[in-house]
Amino acid sequence: MSSKHREDHLKRGSDVSPYESLFAGSVSGGVARAITAPLDTIKIRLQLQTKSHKHPHTQKVSALNVVKDLLKNEGVIALWKGNVPAEILYVMYGAVQFTTYSALSKSLSQMEKDYSIVMPSSVHSLLAGVGAGIASTLTTYPFDLLRTRLVANKKKNLLSMTGTFRKILHAEGISGLFAGIRPAMISVASTTGLMFWSYELAREFSSEYKHVPFIEGICGFVAGATSKGITFPLDTLRKRCQIYSEVYGTKYKSSLRIFMNIVSREGVLGLYRGYGVSILKTAPTSAISLWTYEYVISATRHYRLSKPLV
C-alpha cells in the first residue's frame, strides 16, 4: 500500500465513520489478542500471586517459574486458558474503544469550534481516550472478569465459560460479574487516555519518518509501554478484586481494603507483580492493535476506491 494511504486516522479532525471504526476496531482487537494470548495468561498469573513478608523463605515467583509450573501441571493448552471470553472481550473492546474515541474526538472538535476553545492536541487525545476507556469497560467488563477467573484456575481440567458464569451468578449474583469495576474503570480509563495521548505525541514526533514501514506499530509500542508503565498498580488491584470471592470465599467488598492488604502484606512492590511480562505483553498488543486499526481503514478505503463500479 502506498504511503499516501497511510494517514493518521486517530488524529484530531480525522474523518472516520462509525462503521469504519467499528469494523477496524473489532479486527484490531481480535488480531492483537490472538497473537499475545500466552503473555496475557502469564501476566495475570503473576498478578494473582500473593506473598507475605512474614514468610521470607517463600520461593520467589518469576515469570519463568510460572511458565514451568503451568506447563508441568496444566499442559501447553493452559497458556490459552480463558481465551474464548478473552477473544470476545478484545473484539468487543476494540470495537467500542475505537468507535467511541472517534465519536468523542469529533464531538470535542465541534465543541472547540462552537465555543472558540483552543485545546492542545495532547489534551484532546487524552480526554477522548478516557471516555473511550470508560465506555469500553462498561461494555465488556463481565468478559474481563470471566477471563481472569478462568486463567486463575490452576487445575488441569479447563473450566467452561458458561459453567463459570453460572457459578458466579449463583454464588454472588449479578453484582459478582462487576466485582472490582471501580478500580477497573479508573485503571482502564487512565490507561486508554494515556495510550491515545502518547500515541498521538509519538506520531507527531515521527512525522518525518511517516514512510517507514510499521511506523504506526512503533508509535503504538511506545504508547502501550508508556500508558501501562504509569497505571500498572491499578491493573493489579483490578485483578485481585476479580478473584477475591474465589480466594477468600466471601463476596468482594472494598477495593481500598484489598489495596491496603496488598501493600501491608507484600509491600508496594506487590502492586507491580508481573510488571515486566505486562510491558512485554501490553506494548506489542498496543503496537499490533493500533497498526491493525490504521491499516484496516486504509486498506478498506483503498479497496473501495480501486473497485470498479458496476
Swiss-Prot record:
It is found in: Mitochondrion inner membrane. It comes from the Eukaryota. Mitochondrial transporter that mediates uptake of thiamine pyrophosphate (ThPP) into mitochondria. Belongs to the mitochondrial carrier (TC 2.A.29) family. This is Mitochondrial thiamine pyrophosphate carrier 1. One of its GO terms (molecular function) is thiamine pyrophosphate transmembrane transporter activity. It comes from Lodderomyces elongisporus (strain ATCC 11503 / CBS 2605 / JCM 1781 / NBRC 1676 / NRRL YB-4239) (Yeast). InterPro entries: Mit_carrier, Mitochondrial_sb/sol_carrier, Mt_carrier_dom_sf. PROSITE patterns: SOLCAR (PS50920). It is a multi-pass membrane protein. Keywords: Membrane, Mitochondrion, Mitochondrion inner membrane, Repeat, Transmembrane, Transmembrane helix, Transport. Pfam families: Mito_carr (PF00153). Gene3D superfamilies: Mitochondrial carrier domain (1.50.40.10). GO terms for biological process: mitochondrial thiamine pyrophosphate transmembrane transport. Solcar repeats lie at residues 16-107, 120-205, 211-299. The gene is TPC1. One of its GO terms (cellular component) is mitochondrial inner membrane. Coiled coil: none annotated. The chain crosses the membrane at residues 16-32, 88-104, 117-141, 173-197, 218-234, 274-291.
